[in-house]
From Swiss-Prot:
Belongs to the RNA polymerase beta chain family. It comes from the Bacteria. The gene is rpoB. DNA-dependent RNA polymerase catalyzes the transcription of DNA into RNA using the four ribonucleoside triphosphates as substrates. PROSITE patterns: RNA_POL_BETA. GO terms for cellular component: DNA-directed RNA polymerase complex. This is DNA-directed RNA polymerase subunit beta.
Length: 1372
């Protein structure tokens, strides 16, 4: 290990950063937000509010639930339990320890509760406080989130996926004419609360309006209006306007002329001005709204209508006899011929009728007259009977039920979002705090529904992202917490009523198990709490950014239609239109777009640049789908001059509804931040995505997530510029916590001295222990490698170590290989891939996979199981890898069947034969009363043991191996402590010497006289302890020395304390499951080389299986002798339409040849001492402006940069803003290659040129998780299914290959009768036949006799279950 002391030159880490030639034209004004902040913000900031003081916590998340559940009172109101505050303990184990010990990473929730007890005077009923007790109560352990946004539950890393669900609020829609045979549109409205009962209002085919609660039996909508306290008159007045008809003697009725109510139609009678008597239009002539407005403008106020025109109109008030006040007809009744004659007989002069016409139908009036309920009471009874059928109804119960349904905040919650949505849809102005329904809401929902039926307004689009919101981790767990606390509340009330309340403390009332079990159940069994996809860093990030429409309260994949799954215009910049699974979940599981974020209401927002009067500013505004509809938004690639002014006469803009319009520059409100904001992280890693077909791009994004981390990582030559961001945010790489200087580096850890603090205080030291060969969730290997050297100066958040699938701080999922597109003897037929032996020989695509095997020694009825080397009937050869305790050594090479851990189990006593008695007498007891139950390597696994962990139960004596492992870990901790202390001491004492030199000593070590001036020579002769003994004249210096000593002692004490705590944890034994005495875990690493049958893929959805590995000398090669690595079939391109891979290959070819050119220039500089200017000129030509920071450095650094570039020139071609065909040609031209990107290729077998030029270039290929080693499988004998007695299927059940119906046809076609009989009987489910075959094989005979297959017997049994007695009659 190298370590730093002042003689090593400190150099910045920045020159390690990779430079990519970027083809992007659009300046990035906004950085990609942290890719996993969606998880961390939701849980840590919004739910737990971990880093917030009690007094400053907002009423959200955990705080809001506790506030809403407490205070809890007992039924007699004597006791009251209030919530004061909550806090979390420090977790007992850190993340790594939890993973190793199979524990959950959690922390104890401590809630301070206050119990107030009151004295109630029985006579007056007045209350006095009797006593107050305040106590901190343990409420169970709550899982904490790791820094990477995951949870550790029982030792496995899990992710809680965010859920997309319908936003609370009110929605209006119609059935698209599907329900009624006449294709009539039936409109309906639905109120969806966050929690509580659903309310539906709907039209039927006869235009009567009904309502349902929770999809129960329907009732008339007016019953609901009456239940909220409206009378018939109020209902009619609220929903209808009225108009007055006055009698004109002998002529008819005069009525107000209302042009707004007129539609285009032919008149049935003359249009007469009532004031003048003029006929304006004759019967049969056409009137239009425009003409009506013209007449109104010319002074037409009233028109004359005939007496009969009133027939069929509805009264807008009760019709009374002018003399007797007797009611002749009630409000809302229709005027009939009879009623009209009564009106003329009684000489009634004025009649008020409802305005009902083609624009406003009589639906509510008709419903009202169909409804039998006349008052509120009968309406409430009606509702009660539907919801509680069979229960006796009384008015209190009915009122209470109706109130609890929609108006009780404890049972009904629209949530703040629901209220905002409701207000905006119904144009109301109710406070956001009112999260229950109000009477205004119900009245206005019905109003809007009727307006929709009258063709005013539009229905809601439920797939619009303004109507769908995201529930992230915090909110999902908050809902579980609420369920747990509500259950706990019931038990608290019971306990309050049960015991003597005066002696009870708060902790006696609270039962935390109820809460813990709910939270535990959510994390371990919920559909949204998922085993993290940890194949590679990209799959981790994607999993954390996933949005699922499935899960509790969401859709089910069987019922989800096409519309829900489809891409919607509002997905733009919010949800990726590309990345979604193939198969039944397509469109239901999505990925968030790269730049998207989730706002406080759960709606997804996308960033845009503000445009003011045609000038594009750098101000970035995040808009949700609802807000976005109000603006005109231009594309990111709209032409802009250097001053930011939009160019061109018209700009293409998106407007509401996903439509495009051309507008003038000054009308544009926003433009996109970058074209990349449309797609997800995985899709943004595909170069030339714009040249690929969407289906293939989908496969490409999905397959990148299945790429296995390789031993040698290699970032793509042709990237998109996002690689660094993904590697950094994924948590796979190690980031520096503070600015500092690297003190020590080895393969296991990095020690950095943090700088930037006050000089006189002891520096802090950051020690980064790297992960070495750890197993991921998917058995891939997690291994970190340092990137820094001793003496490097690192800044905070610099990448100091690479993780799996990262290379120099960039994500590297595969390797760059030389690819040729040509057919080769049919070996690349149907997407097969031909590879060169070099790929295998040089481990280009070799990966390490780690399997974990566990054995538990339990306490059984017959005695404890024992882990031992002393196993009965096992040869010494089989025990060769085991130590004296019976556990395998680290480093042992094992294959299937080898013993990993020796274990014996006591077996029950059986009767002893005389021979056994004799053997026992001779050889002793031991061998007979135990059976071998050792852990063996399962079939198909071989490799090297890389780690062994031994866990012993508390109180059980540890074995040698456990003690050795523990000692090793303590030594590691001691080394960390000592190194940290050494660095601190070095700087403390050098600072102390600086302070002392030149000071006059008053007091000090014996060798130094009083009054002597201290020099560095004097100090060299003293020990470190003696330096603290000095007292000097200068009081200020003395003060500084004392401060320094205080800092030093504090740091030293903290270090020792931390060390002691960790050692105590190691030595204290482990919490093992019930009955387990000892657990041993063995990790075996297997190297998987590439072989035929392995699946490989590119980034463009081009996938294939390796068909053959060809010797290097037989592969095609270039004119300079370079052998092609991989041969792909050119026919895989045209029909798939993923042309991006061809452009990638061409640019990769340019990259290799540019690298050769740079290498040539460097060689020329070295050997011929050519001027460095030539190199600089070439670099400027290649990289353009973004190379200036390199060119300003020294010649050595430029040459060092060129040496790196000589391995391959790296390009970045951002999605939708990348290299065009011309740019690719420019690079090929600069590299001195043919612009077609094709070369002459020579056949390795014949040595002759191929007839045509071949496309060759560097292409980035991935090795996918579908390895042939894990799939290939065979069986000779094995388990059989219980009922059918046929062999099981599948590798996991050690099953057979099914010889199915079609295979039987094949044998029938060939007439292979005996083979067929064998297949259907003795090789399958003829039990007796199987036994006979076995017998004849043992005896060495060739007899074959088949019986009746078991499946036939099963069929007969099924017949019998149908009461058909079928018997098989066997004739001899």
């Amino acid at each position: 290990m190298v370590s730093l002391r002042d003689n090593i030159e400190v150099q910045p880490l920045s020159h390690n950063k990779r430079v990519r030639k970027n083809f992007g034209h659009i300046n990035l004004v906004a950085d990609i937000p942290n890719l996993i902040e969606i998880q961390k913000n939701s849980y840590e900031k919004n739910f737990l509010q971990l880093d917030t003081k009690d007094s400053e916590r907002k009423n959200k998340g955990l705080q809001s639930i506790l506030n809403s559940i407490f205070p809890i009172s007992d039924p007699s109101n004597i006791a009251n339990l209030e919530f004061v505050k909550y806090e979390f303990d420090t977790p007992k184990y850190d993340v790594e320890e939890c993973t190793q010990r199979s524990l959950s990473y959690d922390s104890a929730l401590k809630v301070t509760l206050r119990l107030s007890i009151w004295d109630i005077d029985e006579d007056t009923g007045s209350r006095e406080i009797k006593g107050i007790k305040e106590q901190q109560v343990y409420m169970g352990n709550i899982p904490l989130m790791t820094k990477n946004g995951t949870f550790i539950i029982n030792g496995t890393e899990r992710v809680v996926v965010s859920q997309m669900h319908r936003s609370p609020g009110v929605f209006f829609y119609h059935d698209e004419g599907k329900v009624h045979s006449s294709r009539k549109l039936l409109y309906s409205a639905r109120v969806i609360p966050y929690r509580g009962s659903w309310l539906d209002l709907e039209f039927d085919a006869k235009d009567i309006i009904y309502f349902r609660i929770d999809r129960k039996r329907k009732l008339y909508a007016t019953t609901l209006l009456k239940a909220i306290g409206m009378s018939t008159e109020e209902i009619i007045k609220f929903y209808y306007d009225s108009v007055n008809y006055k009698v004109v003697k002998n002529k008819g009725w005069a009525v107000k002329f209302m042009p707004s109510h007129i539609t285009a139609h032919r008149l049935t009678s003359d249009l007469i001005d009532a004031d003048t008597g003029n006929v304006l239009l004759k019967a049969g002539q056409k009137i239009t709204p425009r003409l009506a407005k013209k007449y109104a403008g010319e002074g037409l106020n009233n028109i004359l209508v005939s007496h009969e025109a009133l027939i069929g109109k509805y009264l807008s008030e009760d019709l009374k006899d002018p003399e007797s006040d007797e009611i002749l007809a009630k409000i809302g009744e229709m005027i009939t011929v009879e009623l009209l004659s009564v009106i003329s007989d009684l000489k009634i002069k004025n009649i008020s009728v409802l305005v009902i016409n083609p624009q406003s139908g009589p639906y509510i009036r008709n419903t009202l007259f169909s409804d039998k309920n006349q008052d509120r009471e009968s309406a409430l009874f009606d509702i009660f009977r539907v919801l509680r059928p069979g229960e006796p109804a009384n008015i209190e119960a009915a009122e209470s039920l109706f109130y609890n349904l929609f108006f009780d905040p404890e049972r009904y919650d629209l949530s703040e979002v629901g209220r905002i949505k409701m207000n905006s849809r119904l144009e109301l102005n109710i406070s956001d705090e009112t999260t229950v329904l109000t009477t205004d809401d119900i009245k206005n929902i019905l109003r809007v529904l009727v307006e929709l039926k009258d063709r005013k307004g539009i229905i809601d689009d439920i797939d619009h992202l303004g109507n769908r919101r995201v529930r992230s981790v915090g909110e999902l767990i908050e809902n579980q917490f609420r369920i747990g606390l509500v259950r706990m509340e019931k038990s608290v009330v019971e306990r309050m009523s049960a015991g003597d309340i005066d002696t009870v403390m708060p902790h006696d009332l609270v039962n935390s198990k109820i809460l813990v079990s709910v939270v535990k159940e959510f994390f371990s069994t919920s559909q949204l709490s998922q085993f993290m996809d940890q194949t590679n860093p990209l799959s981790e990030i994607t999993h954390k950014r996933r949005l699922s429409a499935l899960g509790p309260g969401g859709l089910s994949r069987d019922r989800a239609g096409f519309e829900v799954r489809d891409v919607h215009p509002t997905h733009y910049g919010r949800i990726c239109p590309i990345e979604t699974p193939e198969g039944q979940n397509i469109g239901l599981i999505n990925s968030m777009a790269t730049y998207a974020r989730i706002n406080k209401h759960g709606f997804i927002e996308s960033p845009y640049r503000k445009v003011k009067d045609g000038h594009v500013t750098d101000e970035v505004v995040y808009l949700s789908a609802i807000e976005e509809g109000k603006y005109k938004i231009g594309q990111a690639n709209s032409k802009v001059d250097k001053d930011g002014i939009l160019q061109g006469e018209f700009i293409n803009c998106r407007v509401e509804g996903g439509n495009f319009v051309m507008v003038e520059p000054h009308e544009v409100d926003f433009i996109d931040v970058t074209p990349m904001q449309v797609v997800s992280v995985a899709a943004s890693l595909i170069p030339f995505l714009e040249n690929d077909d969407a289906n293939r791009a989908l496969m490409g994004s999905n397959m990148q997530r299945q790429a296995v981390p390789l031993i040698k990582t290699d970032a793509p030559f042709v990237g998109t510029g996002v690689e660094g961001v993904v590697a950094k945010d994924s948590g796979a790489s190690v980031l520096a916590l503070n600015d500092g200087i690297v003190e020590q580096v080895d393969s296991n850890r990095i020690v950095i001295r943090a700088i930037g603090q006050k000089t006189e205080s002891a520096p802090s030291v950051d020690i980064y222990n790297l992960l070495k060969f750890q197993k991921s969730n998917h058995n891939t290997c997690i291994n970190q490698k340092p990137l820094v050297k001793v003496g490097h100066y690192v800044k905070k958040n610099d990448i100091i170590a690479d993780g799996p699938s990262t290379d120099n701080g960039e994500i590297a999922l595969g390797r760059n290989v030389l690819v040729a597109f040509l057919p080769w003897n049919g070996y690349n037929f149907e997407d097969s891939i031909l590879i060169s032996e070099r790929i295998v020989k040089e481990d280009v695509f070799t990966s390490v996979h780690i399997e974990e095997f566990e054995v538990i020694a339990r306490d059984t009825r017959l005695g404890p199981e024992e882990i031992t080397r002393d196993i009965p009937n096992v040869s010494e050869e089989a025990l060769r890898h085991l130590d004296e305790v019976g556990i395998i050594y680290v480093g042992a090479e094992v294959k299937a069947g080898d013993i990993l851990v020796g274990k014996v189990t006591p077996k029950s006593e059986s009767p002893i034969t005389p021979e056994e008695k004799l053997l026992r007498a001779i050889f002793g007891e031991k061998a007979f009363d135990v059976k071998d139950s050792s852990l063996h390597v399962p079939s198909g696994v071989s490799g090297t043991v890389v780690e062994v962990r031994v866990f012993s139960r508390r109180g059980v004596e540890k074995d040698q191996r456990a003690i050795a492992i523990e000692k090793q870990q303590i030594e590691k901790l001691a080394k960390d402590r000592d190194d940290e202390l050494e660095i601190i001491e070095h700087f403390v004492f050098s600072w102390l010497e600086k302070l002392l030199v030149g000071q006059v000593s008053i007091n000090g070590p014996k060798t130094v006289k009083t009054g002597q001036t201290i020099t560095s020579e004097i100090l060299k002769g003293l020990s470190k302890g003696q330096l603290w003994q000095f007292t000097v004249e200068d009081a200020n210096v003395m003060n500084e020395i004392e401060q320094l000593k205080g800092h030093y002692d504090g740091k030293k004490e903290a270090l020792n304390k931390r060390f002691a705590t960790k050692v105590e944890k190691l030595q204290s034994g482990d919490d093992l499951p019930q009955g387990a005495l000892k657990v041993v875990k063995v990790f075996i690493a297997t190297k998987h080389k590439l072989q035929p049958g392995d699946k490989m893929a590119g980034r463009h959805g081009n996938k294939g299986v390796i068909s053959r590995i060809v010797p290097e000398e037989d592969m095609p090669f270039l004119e300079d002798g370079t052998v092609v690595d991989i041969v792909l079939n050119p026919l895989g391109l045209p029909s798939r339409m993923n042309i991006g891979q061809v452009l990638e290959t061409h640019l990769g070819w340019a990259s290799v040849n540019l690298a050769k050119k740079i290498a040539g220039l460097v060689e020329e500089h070295k050997t011929k001492h050519a001027s460095i200017e030539k190199i600089k000129k070439f670099l400027i030509e290649l990289y353009g402006e973004n190379i200036n920071h390199i060119l300003e450095k020294s010649d050595e650094e430029i040459i060092s940069f060129c040496n790196e570039a000589a391995k391959g020139v790296y390009f970045a071609t951002p999605v939708f803003d990348g290299a065009k065909v011309e740019d690719v040609k420019d690079m090929l031209r600069l590299a001195g290659q043919d612009l077609s990107g094709q070369v002459k290729l020579i056949d390795g077998r014949t040595g002759e040129y191929f007839d045509r030029l071949v496309t060759v270039g560097q292409k980035y290929l991935l090795k996918l998780h579908h390895l042939v080693d894990n799939k290939i499988h065979s069986r000779s004998i094995g388990p059989y299914s219980l009922v059918t007695q046929q062999p099981l299927g599948g590798k996991s059940h050690f099953g057979g290959q099914r010889f199915g119906e079609m295979e039987c046809w094949a044998l029938q076609a060939y007439g292979a009768a005996y083979t067929l009989q064998e297949m259907l009987t003795v090789k399958s489910d003829d039990v007796n036949g199987r036994i006979k075959i076995y017998d004849s094989i043992v005896r060495g005979e060739n007899n074959f006799e088949s019986g009746i297959p078991e499946s036939f017997n099963v069929m007969i049994k099924e017949f019998r279950s149908l009461c058909l007695n079928v018997k098989l009659e066997v004739t001899s």
